[in-house]
């Protein structure tokens, strides 16, 4: 039998201590002040026009990187102040330094390269993002990654408020490079796909430790793979290409759980499941039934941020597979300016509570307001109205 490292032995001892104290659940009194919170956010915010202009001039080669960074720093400083003002218990940097919610992080991993593309890797139901993608060119690893410094700056602004960091789920690297890409051919190192899954998991374990050492205690994995696997049409298309989606789903859950082995006891890691969010449009539709048992029943994240702002997400019945995690209901859309009716949202929370105890439920926008630098079709004022509404509802439901 393989001997466990001293570091892993210490981790197991601490894990057992926490379970002895709290029974492994989230409903204990000591866990109530931990994220995700009763009213929370997914992560991205609309970029100010001044920042958009700076990014355009930088892309055109008219200003230096330092000038762009100064503009980003100022915009993030203003954003964090507004997040605190609206009463958020966890703040993000709005993803203001990114072009895309996922590709900037993935392309900065070792062994991963951003490349041009004829079209986006999945088709939206309307406007399409600027075409680019990533590919695996060498061993996937986490090295000197710029997102650690991004987090440190956010942490310096957060003060007594919790700083939340969002990154793409490890599933996204495999999905984009190996599933969506019709011309994928593994490099020699990864002809055995199990080795690829393991390397991605190990890279993300390093990421978890690096963020933790930088002070991060609230990390979110953003993931559109599950949204795609909920879509009947996409399932048929992938299966027609020879993919066994049940096998892939199990591999993804196993990989994510492997990543979570590196999570210290006082760190929260959640997952946001998305069906696409670009210029107020989407690319997937379908309830959670096809993935619920594998994902909700097997993935060990601390909470799930789930889209539920339209009938494209189906009903709440699949939530019966949830264990003791928190479920953050995305009942308020981030795609349009229309302000939801407070009573309607409360009724939907009551419906969800038939399948998950109310004490495990929270409320959030269905997605970020700007998953790419272009942003959804609403105003900054609209996004703050949405967050104030969410806080009001949460305070009335969970008094």
Place the predicted regions along the sequence by residue:
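Short, Lys/Arg-enriched N-terminal segments with co-localized hydrophobic residues
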Residues: 10-27
């Amino acid at each position: 039998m393989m001997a466990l490292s001293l570091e892993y032995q210490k981790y197991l001892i601490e894990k057992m201590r926490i379970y002895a104290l709290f029974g492994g659940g989230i409903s204990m009194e000591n866990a109530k002040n931990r994220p995700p919170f009763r009213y929370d956010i997914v992560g991205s915010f609309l970029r100010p026009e001044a920042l958009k202009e700076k990014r355009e001039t930088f892309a055109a080669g008219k200003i230096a990187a330092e000038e762009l960074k100064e503009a980003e720093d100022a915009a993030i400083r203003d954003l964090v102040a507004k997040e605190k003002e609206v009463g958020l218990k966890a703040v993000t940097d709005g993803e203001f330094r990114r072009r895309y919610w996922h590709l900037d992080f993935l392309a900065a991993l070792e062994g991963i390269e951003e490349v041009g593309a004829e079209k986006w890797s999945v088709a939206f139901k309307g406007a399409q993002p600027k075409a680019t993608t990533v590919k695996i060119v060498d061993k996937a690893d986490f090295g000197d990654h710029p997102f650690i410094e991004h987090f440190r700056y956010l942490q310096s602004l957060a003060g007594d408020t919790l700083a939340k960091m969002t990154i793409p789920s490890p599933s996204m690297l495999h999905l984009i490079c190996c599933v969506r890409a019709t011309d994928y051919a593994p490099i020699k190192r990864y002809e055995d796909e199990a080795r690829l899954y393991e390397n991605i998991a190990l890279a993300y374990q390093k990421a978890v430790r690096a963020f933790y050492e930088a002070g991060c205690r609230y990390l979110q994995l953003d993931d559109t793979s599950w949204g795609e696997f909920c879509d009947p049409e996409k399932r048929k298309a992938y299966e027609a290409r020879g993919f066994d989606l049940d096998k892939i789903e199990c591999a993804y859950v196993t990989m994510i759980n492997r990543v979570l082995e590196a999570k210290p006891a006082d760190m929260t890691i959640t997952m946001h499941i998305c069906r696409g969010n670009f210029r107020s449009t989407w690319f997937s539709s379908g309830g959670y039934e096809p993935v619920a048992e594998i994902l909700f029943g097997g993935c060990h994240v601390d909470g799930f941020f789930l889209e539920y702002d339209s009938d494209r997400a189906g009903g709440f019945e699949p939530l019966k597979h949830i264990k003791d995690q928190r479920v953050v209901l995305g009942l308020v859309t981030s795609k349009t300016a229309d302000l939801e009716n407070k009573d309607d949202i409360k009724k939907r929370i009551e419906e969800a509570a038939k399948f998950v105890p109310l004490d495990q439920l929270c409320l959030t926008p269905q997605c970020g307001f700007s998953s790419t630098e272009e942003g959804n079709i609403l105003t900054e004022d609209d996004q703050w109205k949405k967050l104030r509404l969410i806080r009001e509802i949460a305070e009335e439901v969970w008094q």
